[in-house]
Amino acid sequence: MRSVAVVPAAGSAERFGGKKLLATIDGEPLLDRTIAALLAGGVDQIIVVVAPEAVELQHDVNAFTDARVWTVVNPDPSRGMFSSLQAGMAEAQGDALVVLPADMPFVQGATVRLLLETFAQKAAIVSPRFNGKRGHPVILPPSLRDEIRAADPSLTLHDILKRHQDQRVDVAVDDQGVVRDVDRPEDLPGR
């Protein structure tokens, strides 16, 4: 099974007040931690979707010097995160499509691995649940790729997934990172 992750990273980070994905946690950029969790979880390829002007972010991704990690540019990120997901899905060719927003650096690699293992057994839409709350990453079957690409960019992934409730499988995890993102500087540890 070939897994491909799409990591939307083209947002403006207005609530954070600047370059959120390059902010550090224990000396490591937030985006790098998100990518590292996906690699540790066994994802085969990672597509990071960036804004056209995000040169520093592109350099950060390119610093991985890992052919499994590369960028795609969302030509109009002002249309929202779903448009970044669509841009990434246009390039994603895999049996399991992993969606993890870039601002979720607390997800554990073991959680990603567990979700992929569950997907391999059930080939459904697989989501983690922490304390009863659904989170990310979400694993999608390739059958949803074209539906996502063709959808109106004003929609959300949640809108698409609501159409497929009968295909959803939730996995209880002991990983708060699946429901913890970074929106403001105070969301980072030690601040």
Regions found by a protein language model. Give the residues of each.
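Nucleotide and nucleotide-moiety/phosphate-recognizing core
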Residues: 2-134, 166-173
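Conserved alpha/beta core of the MobA/IspD/sugar-nucleotide pyrophosphorylase nucleotidyltransferase superfamily
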Residues: 150-191
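Short, well-structured alpha-helical patches and their helix-loop capping segments
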Residues: 107, 132, 136, 140, ...
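Short beta-strand-to-turn element immediately C-terminal to the catalytic PLP-Schiff-base lysine
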Residues: 23-25, 139-141, 181-183
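Conserved nucleotide-sugar donor-binding
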Residues: 94, 135-146, 185
